[in-house]
Amino acid sequence: MASTRRPVGARTLLACASLLAAMGLGVPESAEPVGTHARPQPPGAELPAPPANSPPEPTIAHAHSVDPRDAWMLFVKQSDKGINSKRRSKARRLKLGLPGPPGPPGPQGPPGPFIPSEVLLKEFQLLLKGAVRQRESHLEHCTRDLTTPASGSPSRVPAAQELDSQDPGALLALLAATLAQGPRAPRVEAAFHCRLRRDVQVDRRALHELGIYYLPEVEGAFHRGPGLNLTSGQYTAPVAGFYALAATLHVALTEQPRKGPTRPRDRLRLLICIQSLCQHNASLETVMGLENSSELFTISVNGVLYLQAGHYTSVFLDNASGSSLTVRSGSHFSAILLGL
């Protein structure tokens, strides 16, 4: 019968198994090594006996046991050869080709609990009430300093309290109106509008700083933030930023114009200056000639200045004419913080 051929890996495993079996079975001392059985010697072939005083011949030491660690290291070294080698495994993986298509989806889970539409509507109403309350609190904070006592606007019931008596259609309408408003404009932190309390006399060839203002209690007037000194007429910037400033003066001539042509240098200058230094700092200025002016006229100036925190601005009137002037009460001065 033809002998079967074992692969190299099988022979390696058999050798390691033999070594492991030898670990538990020690070779007895009386046993002779394999292949050392005495064979019959032919006549005359006996070796001569050694002399009596000669040293004894060295004997071959017999192995009584196998070290387990050496056997395991041999097994590990031999396990990477043959069919278990890394190169052969890598070549086998490359021959597998592309993976197949994904399998079918698993079974669908059980359906969740049934929630009635009434419960969903109540939860939606609660969410809508919370959103409306949050919006009202923000609007109240934004408009707390905007209204004046003279506005006399009647108090209304908050919309969040009105939701309790509204039907679902009204709730949806309120939600749509809230979303249609879009993003709100940023809050203005500093602004004012004041008027001159009484008439102010300005002598000829004089530069006069206006003061003695008051806050009008009319619809549309506003005052928000600190910094306005009504007595001195100076507005101190609470924070550094860009400020839009405006001033409008109603001016009356107190003296009758002299006979003859008016001199070209008879003019008025209206200025808004920083720290009362109109020549050194940036300022807003308007120049008006008096050649064709009437006895009562209006002069205005407006623009944007950057103010540092703690710096003040005020209104100046430069009367570069040959007659005195009167700034009428009701002339106004205003400012608003545009941004930082």
Swiss-Prot record:
Spell out the protein name for this chain.
Answer: Erythroferrone
Site Required for correct protein folding in the endoplasmic reticulum: give positions.
319
Q: Which gene encodes it?
A: Erfe
Subunit (UniProt): Homodimer; disulfide-linked. Forms trimer, hexamers and higher molecular weight oligomers. May form heteromeric complexes with C1QTNF2 and C1QTNF12 and, to a lesser extent, with C1QTNF5 and C1QTNF10. Interacts with BMP5 and BMP7; the interaction inhibits BMP-induced transcription of HAMP. Interacts with BMP6; the interaction inhibits BMP-induced transcription of HAMP. Interacts with BMP2. Interacts with heterodimers composed of BMP2 and BMP6 in vitro, the interaction inhibits the heterodimer binding to its receptor BMPR1A /ALK3 and thereby suppresses expression of HAMP.
**Description of what induces expression:** Up-regulated by intracellular increase in cAMP levels, such as those elicited by forskolin and epinephrine treatments, and increase in calcium (ionomycine). Up-regulated by exercise in skeletal muscle (at protein level) and blood plasma (at protein level). Drastically down-regulated by fasting. Up-regulated in skeletal muscle by refeeding; the extent of induction by refeeding may be dependent upon the muscle fiber type, being much higher in soleus than in plantaris. Both glucose and lipid are equally potent in this induction, in the absence of any gut-derived hormones.
Q: Any idea where the C1q domain is?
A: 185-340
Question: Can you list the GO cellular component terms from the UniProt entry?
Answer: extracellular region; extracellular space
Q: Which GO terms describe its biological process?
A: establishment of localization in cell; fatty acid transport; intracellular iron ion homeostasis; negative regulation of apoptotic process; negative regulation of autophagy; negative regulation of BMP signaling pathway; negative regulation of osteoblast differentiation; negative regulation of osteoclast differentiation
Q: What is its main location?
A: secreted
Source species of the chain: Mus musculus (Mouse)
